[in-house]
């Protein structure tokens, strides 16, 4: 939630905000993707695409779109939804409707209203993974974090107050916001480490996919308002963990996942991409929107964000004139 890769050390940010993910980046079980964008700057608009057939490229109405939960259940998967976000808040109800399709649901946040509020840190979600039966190998588990959503200082416990290092200096508002956001990113990294410990040691997950809904502009007046759009609001992390078993059983898909680490992509196509990873390619699936399919037909000239109103090729710092140099630096860093 609200995590821009521009504040993640694993993606080149100056502060070490992601010690776990920085280490995971050199683990061959993980693949980090370098040029991934959100399709919008707000949660509902993003996740109603990322988790359903609807995307920027097919023009489908949400009311006509199947969700990944629909198709997983039809294919015999046990589905579980674990969330620290509100189920019925004004900003959350469409996502709550998707989560409510799951066989098992754990909604920690009972708040109903117009604010984004929770009484729990995201680590409160971790014990609910122990309610999942690891013996059932045909499962889809969705975890929805509160992440780095405003107010940043409410997203992490005191022991993760790492910045500023020198608390005696007076700070401008922009510096305070930057420090608080980075502390939330550091805590989020710890949450991901905790989730992955459960996923690998208890659930023995075949694969884990992690992405942010959208990014954040961190200034004196931070946020992700579409009316003040800039690209840092849609710069998001995306990575996949694959177990040894997944590599062995799905060698072609695993090889394609690793080969596509530097291919630009937008997260409204995660539905088709996840369908491909799960082997659900019979119906309600478009291989042209699956990043790991040979049929994937999007590139930097056609990729969009903001529901088709902004072309990703205009983000020249990331994928324009400097794309090849960025890729070289990224690959060199991985080998260090």
PLM feature spans:
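Active-site rim elements
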Residues: 55-59, 113-116, 175-189, 196-197, ...
